[in-house]
A protein has these predicted regions:
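S-adenosylmethionine
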Residues: 1-249
Length: 249
């Protein structure tokens, strides 16, 4: 419905499909596919050669990004803080030409300081409460406490701040969570943009809904909003959130 790359199987074991075993295809929610495509296609100014997935594990979005980067002649750095999850990312990228993607194990919060202004595109698929996937994982509600939102929101701010420092002027950062909670979504985006503006790093929020409409066979229900929120009951996806910011100074 909303991912131009999706194939819906009504039954069977996906693991028996050769393309999935070879990592040429993967099992992923359509919402996750769409936000990764938005990250790959959002309009930027200037070169489009260096891409970064700041929180790449377990690798579904990274694989899609890497394939898109290879098609465009760009290179993807897939960063993941967990060694185990970094291994999953390497497995997910097996079908991508090795010179087009590289996996690194490190803390994404450090990249903005260590490599300022290096990247043209950055995806921040931030750790979150996962409240947007309750339709598939209803038991997750019992593993979360109200205080988790506050803790994760601070981490999300740090990661988005790092991403905006790592992207060059004219480049774009796509911020994604699998949560509809405002404390993890729009408030993070606006707070970070406001804080960095005080330090002289300016951004503009691009219209993620317009990018989604251009890509999706059927526009998402919330495509009229500049920050895109998907919904299970309207879009048939997890409740993914997506915002696109372009660095202007």
């Amino acid at each position: 419905r909303i991912s131009p790359l999706a194939v819906v199987l009504v039954g069977g074991d996906p693991g028996r499909i050769e393309a999935i075993r070879d990592s040429r295809a993967g099992v992923e929610d359509e919402g996750s596919q769409l936000v990764a495509l938005i990250a790959a296609e959002a309009p930027l100014e200037g070169r489009d050669e260096r891409w970064l997935d700041l929180c790449a594990g377990p690798g579904g979005k990274a694989a899609l990004l890497a394939a898109r980067a290879a098609q465009k002649g760009a290179h993807l750095l897939a960063n993941e803080v967990s060694p185990h999850r970094a291994g999953l990312v390497r497995s997910a990228l097996r079908a991508v030409p090795p010179d087009m993607a590289h996996v690194r194990c490190g803390d994404g919060r450090d990249l903005g300081r260590d490599e300022p202004g290096r990247y043209d595109r950055v995806l921040v698929d931030a750790p979150c409460t996962g409240l947007g996937s309750l339709r598939r994982r209803p038991e997750a509600r019992w593993r979360r406490q109200p205080g988790d939102v506050t803790v994760l929101a601070e981490l999300q701010r740090e990661l988005l701040t790092s991403a905006l420092r790592a992207v060059r002027r004219g480049g774009v950062v796509t911020y994604v969570t699998c949560s509809p909670h405002a404390l993890e979504t729009s408030l993070v985006v606006r707070d970070v943009a406001r804080l960095l503006a005080r330090e002289g790093l300016s951004t503009e929020i691009l219209h993620a809904g317009d990018v989604a409409t251009r890509l999706a066979p059927q526009p998402p229900a919330g495509a009229d909003c500049e920050m895109l929120q998907l919904w299970p009951h309207l879009d048939g996806t997890d409740a993914m959130f997506c915002a696109v910011l372009r660095r202007t100074s």
